[in-house]
Amino acid sequence: MDRSDTNRGTPLFTFPLLLQTAKHHIPILIGIAVAARLAMFRLDEVIFSWRSTDMASIALNYYRNGFHFLYPQVFWGGNGPGYVEMECPIIPFLLALLYRLFGVQDWLALVIPVTSGVGLVVTVYLFSRHLFDPAVGFVAGLFTATSPPLVALSTALWPDPPMVFFGALGLYLIVQWVETNKWGYFVFGASAITIAILLKLTALYLGIPLLYLCYVKYGSGLWKSASVWLLAFLILILPCLWYIHAHTLYREYHNTFGILSGGFLKFATAEVLLDPGFYGKSLGRMIFYHFTPLVFVVFILGIMVSQRDRLHYTFHVWAVTVLLYFLVAARGVSLGHFQYMLPVVPPGAALAGYGTLLLLRKLESVPSLARWPKGTWALALALLYLGGTVVAAHVYQSPEMYTTKMWAHDKRTGLAVGRLTAPGSLIVVVDNQMGGPPDGIMTPPNVFYFSDRRGWYLAMSWLTEDLIEQKRREGARYLVITANTVATFEESCPQIQGYLTARYVPLLDSEEGLLYDLAPGKEGATKSDRPN
């Protein structure tokens, strides 16, 4: 039986008519989602951040070096091929195929994130409509369509919107299987969740709501069901094979995104979990950015109301699981990497949609408020929500944000290096973004991508004269001090700067950064030798 339009415990609500008329819900939500992305969209920032430039670099390497799917390559792999341990490179591979069809153009990097973001809006609507009713679905879809972090991440090349989309789609299809026992839902639901885990290993958190749905279907005897074990096998077999392969790439080539070993690991440490500031900052980001204040209030209202049966608690279990996942990925969350908190949007929006109708019903029952024109109610709530959303988007995506300014400076440095260095040459990029040991950091890829050069990354704290000479012997032709680091470098490393200036020709000394030609002796790089 199709229960998408039946009442599943949602409070009665008599206005406005748009919420009750499902016919045009999906086109309206798609229109709102597209409009929100157009409002936030900036072509020069589609490929801009660390993760975006890494993904675009891998896509370029597929496009240029052959479509060898199992061997993703980064630009910062030194003088080697740059094969890297990472999540399954589905997105950069598809982007490379788009490059093959249409040429290398930045706007192509929008296709997958935008499609995933809009797809998530539709999925949340259908899911919420199915478990509650069309009115809840529409409000949940509206909250998803205008969610500040989802809008921001789906207008740039990030893997998180596709991961969250496929995870939500998979759970929705598995709910359909639980109710109907149709194997098409089973297979496609398992496939969607497999893709989510391939895109990001952290999507393993979906296992808890999946286990809950199996419990709804089979009760305490779920362990005896062959379907449950088959579901687990179908979901996990490809991710296991991929991540085993990815780890072999790390062991051989020593490049990693920090997903399994080496690099910066985002997982919790005792220090982070015992820090009260972690919880305060994370809660603040969730209230003011991922939800916005009004949505957070109705989310709390929605999650506190009891439901009529076990299946209705799917969103509750999903939301609580995401909160537990924040603790698992606490180190990444603590640094303000808001993409780690994106999975809260779908279950949060669904419960907030339910809570919104509860709130409106309660307000409608107050005699002094019931006399207000219904259009006034709708306008007041819409303005309150819109205000919180616009403020959140402005604050967190402002050009004055530290990371935005840092990435902008890296882009300027990279473009300058691309102009001044020989194509195909190897570079050494030095900055102060990373200060830990080499095997415990992320590698900033921006300068490599925007210069279209390969090479090595060195944190300024590691820099020595011997290390510079070692990289030169390994093939480095140029050394770059990024625009973000010039002032600190000149203040903290005058001896190394003097060494470089005495031995090598400076090709750049400006607000775009410092650039030295590491050809042997100053006579090795006269002005006539410099690239135009």
Predicted regions: what they are:
Residues 38-39, 204, 355, 360, ...:
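Transmembrane alpha-helical segments
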Residues 108-131, 169, 173:
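Transmembrane-helix motifs of polytopic, lipid-linked glycan transferases
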Residues 31-34, 140-145, 193, 197:
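Short helix- or helix-capping micro-motifs
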Residues 38-42, 52-83, 90:
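Extracytosolic helix-loop segments that constitute the early lumenal/periplasmic catalytic or substrate-binding loops
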